[in-house]
C-alpha cells in the first residue's frame, strides 16, 4: 500500500466510541484495524519505514494499546522492545514519572535497566492526544540516559494540541484527525 494511502486505511479501520472511558471523550477503537491482517501489516510497515537503517536500538510501547503496535515494530527493526507501564505493574526496580491525561492523571514506569546509556529509542503508541503520555515517555528515556529518536502514532487528535508539547520534528502520525 502506498504511503499516501495509509491515513485513509487507518481511518477506514477505526471506530469512534463516544463517552468512553468517561463522558465527553471519544475513544478511538483500533481493534477493527488489528483484526485485519493486511491492514495491520500495512500499519506496521508504515511505522517502520523511516527507521529501517539501524537507527533504533529499542522501541518503547506505552501500556496498553501501544504494546500491540510497538512489539511488531521492534521485531521488524531488529530492536529490543521496552514496555512502559502504569505504576505498580513492573516487577523490578523502576524509574517513574507522572503526567496529565486527556481524562485525568497517571504515572508510568520503566525498569531501571531497560535502556543502555546512548540507546536510540523510538516511542510507539496508538493515539497522540494531549501529548502528556509521550512527554512522560521522553522524560523516562532521558532519565535513563538514552536518546529518543522518534515518536510514532497511529492516530493524532490534532485539536488536543499534543504535537505542540513534543519535539515536532520527531512526531509522525499515520492519521491526523
Swiss-Prot record:
GO cellular component, one term: cytoplasm
The protein's Enzyme Commission number: 2.4.2.7
Keyword Transferase: yes
Pathways per UniProt: Purine metabolism; AMP biosynthesis via salvage pathway; AMP from adenine: step 1/1
Record's catalysed reaction(s): AMP + diphosphate = 5-phospho-alpha-D-ribose 1-diphosphate + adenine
PROSITE patterns: PUR_PYR_PR_TRANSFER
Subcellular localization: Cytoplasm
Transferase in keyword set: yes
GO biological process terms, semicolon-separated: adenine salvage; AMP salvage; purine ribonucleoside salvage
MF annotations from Gene Ontology: adenine binding; adenine phosphoribosyltransferase activity; AMP binding
InterPro entries (UniProt xref): Ade_phspho_trans, PRibTrfase_dom, PRTase-like, UPRTase/APRTase
Alphabetical UniProt keywords: Cytoplasm, Glycosyltransferase, Purine salvage, Transferase
NCBIfam families found in the cross-reference section: apt (TIGR01090), PRK02304.1-3 (NF002634), PRK02304.1-5 (NF002636)
Xref: PANTHER family: ADENINE PHOSPHORIBOSYLTRANSFERASE (PTHR32315:SF3)
Similarity comment: Belongs to the purine/pyrimidine phosphoribosyltransferase family.
Oligomeric and partner information: Homodimer.
Its biological purpose: Catalyzes a salvage reaction resulting in the formation of AMP, that is energically less costly than de novo synthesis.
Name of protein: Adenine phosphoribosyltransferase
Gene designation per UniProt: apt
